[in-house]
Amino acid sequence: FISQGSAADSLTDIYELALQSDPTLRAARANFQVGRETKNISRAYLLPVISASADFTRTERNSESSQVYSFIQDDPFLSKSFSDTDTTSYGVSLTQAIFDMPAWYQFQSGKALSESASAQFASDQQSLILRVSSAYLNALRAFDNNETRKAEQRAIQRQLEQTQERFEVGLLPITDVHEAQAIYDDALVNSLEAQGALNIAFDALQVLTGQNHDSLSGLTDGFMAVNPEPLDSQDWVSFSLNNNYQLKVAELGKDSSYNQAKAATAQLYPKITASARYSDTDSDGTQTSYLPTESSSGVSSLSDGHSFGVSLSMPIWASGINSGRRQAKQRSIAASENFEVAKRNTAQTARSRHQLVITNTARVKARKQAITSAESARNATQAGYEVGTRNIVDVLAAQRSVFQAKRNYANARYDYIFAMMQLKEVAGQLSPDDIYQLNAWLDPSLTVAK
């Protein structure tokens, strides 16, 4: 039913809820955060590495020895000694790559992957706009279909009742009643199926928002289908080749693979690394001896030092480098070919969607005219039935044609709207503004409910 009220959810309501609750978008946002760190991770191999160390050691030592200290007596004296030493050391070291081409190309690859993550997330955001629009329009489509199916059922039921009355007074044969009954039964089945489809369409909104939605704002009768601007399909192809986000993902994947191949080749290049180190060591302790008298002395030492160096390393032979280089090269070739495929598909999709919008624009106008034609045909058939030139099957078929024309018109309008959004999506121009512009054509005073 359609009721007057303001409690209905609008398209912007659904979209804004989906921005916060859609699990697909949340997963895409997390993947974007993962991807954007790739640049930082790969850049780390070009930055200096600073490390610090600290060490504390306590050493205790006991010793005993027998010694003779008299030429007269041979009795030995027992000599004992004990030492206790604490040693503390600190160190700071720095290493910096001066020339490391594999790390440089890995950094370039990481930058491309981070940019690819941004492009993919932009594509995912456009995908949400399409999914929200599709789900909302499908709910409106299902509602219109359900309304016409119920109206069709009621109209056929009235015709069936009139046919039965005429049969009872001997004006019609029993075959007309059976034919009308068969058509009514089919209309009843269609009505039940339409109600089920309406419930399913409303439930699909819950996947996006996590909430139940029982009523929506309907599309106004004043909505007009117009041709895309610009009208030339080649302009839309150019937009798509320059702005399509999935094409950007493919291009950046190609760039990343190219730099990966360069990094694999550079494994045979020399690497130059600079290093610096500073260290400090402090030792304090005591040493006690018994000879056999006791004597004690302190032990202390302090030392520090620093070093600087530059090292060069170059692989002479390493197993697997050549295989890795060939593998990376083939991956780069594959990525380049995939990018070419994406370019061609994007251009073809832009042309086909542009043509679909133009076709749907004309289709909306034709479907609207078809309603008038179907109603005229129904009236003529009804008049022929009254004078006996047409039978009940003709009348019911004419009535069903009117309702079918109304369904076709509603479907044509929704198809046009979604086709226009798909065209903007492939051209990289779809944005939340399109949601808000479409929402302006939804009548908040009309509530579409399941």
Task: Describe the residue ranges of each PLM region.
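Periplasmic alpha-helical coiled-coil/stalk elements that build and connect Gram-negative outer-membrane
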Residues: 9, 127-241, 356, 360, ...
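Bacterial Sec-pathway N-terminal export signals of envelope proteins
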Residues: 5-55, 61, 213, 219-260, ...
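Small/polar, glycine/serine/threonine/aspartate-rich low-complexity segments that form flexible
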Residues: 53-96, 222-230, 262, 275-316, ...
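Short flexible linkers and secondary-structure junctions
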Residues: 8-138, 146, 272, 276, ...
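Sec/SRP-type N-terminal targeting helices
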Residues: 26-30, 43-44, 82-85, 98-125, ...
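Acidic, low-complexity, intrinsically disordered peripheral segments
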Residues: 408-450
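A glycine-biased, small/acidic residue-tolerant capping/turn segment at secondary-structure junctions
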Residues: 375-396, 421-436
